[in-house]
Amino acid sequence: MVTGISEENDDEETFSAVHSSTPSINSQSYAIPITEEMSSSFHDSISTTSNSSGSFDSDGSNVSDVVEQNEMDNESNVDEDLFLDNDIPQSSNLLPTDAQDPGPIFDVSRYIFDSLKQSIDSADFSEALSLQTKTSAVINSKSLELKQYIDEMKSRLTQLQEKFENGEATSKKIKRDLETSRKNIDYLNAALRVDFPIEFNQAREKILERRLNEDHDC
């Protein structure tokens, strides 16, 4: 009896050492915890196996079998964790399947480039270039003609300004001469009317008759 109790104590110490070398329960997210009932039943099975064998060697082999069984259980728990991790979808993949695709982004620069390319290809570029050259030549020639006309008008305007200034001076001189002549005529009329009244009146009548005849002929 004492030998059986000591062997059972040795088995418990060996199981405790083996159990302490296994990975922690907390590191396994989905591992099933070992309760006290499971531990007691496990101890009973070990004691029953050791009593039936009747030798220490057979007990050692049973303990090694138990250690291997625990390692297999741990591996199965790890496989189960991997299966659960693969089975649970990631948060990045939890997008709704009916979400609409925004589609490709509109490339403005590409659109402009394609439009210009089509316009160049559709038109005769050489003809357009020649037409542009002719138009530039016509514009340049007309610009030169306009410049010549402007220069001529400037010179002509200068001449007219000089003539106008000269004509203004001449008209002022003529006006002064006319005023002087009018004064002289008035002076002579006054003198003749006083000194020669009969001759003055006869001459005046002749002048008036001549004017009347000219008006009648017209």
From Swiss-Prot:
Q: Which residues form a coiled coil?
A: 142-192
Q: Which Gene Ontology CC terms are recorded? A: BLOC-1 complex; endosome
- Keywords, in A-Z order: Coiled coil, Endosome, Transport
Biological process terms from the Gene Ontology for this record are: endosome organization; regulation of protein localization
Which compartments does it reside in? Endosome
Q: Give the signal peptide, or none.
A: none
Region Disordered: start-end pairs: 1-65
Q: Could you tell me where the Low complexity compositional bias lies?
A: 39-65
Q: Which InterPro entries match?
A: BLOC-1_subunit_KXD1, KxDL_dom
Q: Where is this motif: KxDL?
A: 175-179
Record field: compositional bias (Polar residues): 17-30
Oligomeric state and interaction partners are given as:
Component of the biogenesis of lysosome-related organelles complex-1 (BLOC-1) composed of at least BLI1, BLS1, CNL1, KXD1, SNN1 and VAB2.
Family from the record = Belongs to the KXD1 family.
Q: What does this protein do?
A: Component of the biogenesis of lysosome-related organelles complex-1 (BLOC-1) involved in endosomal cargo sorting.
Q: What is this protein called?
A: Biogenesis of lysosome-related organelles complex 1 subunit KXD1
- Biological source species: Saccharomyces cerevisiae (strain ATCC 204508 / S288c) (Baker's yeast)
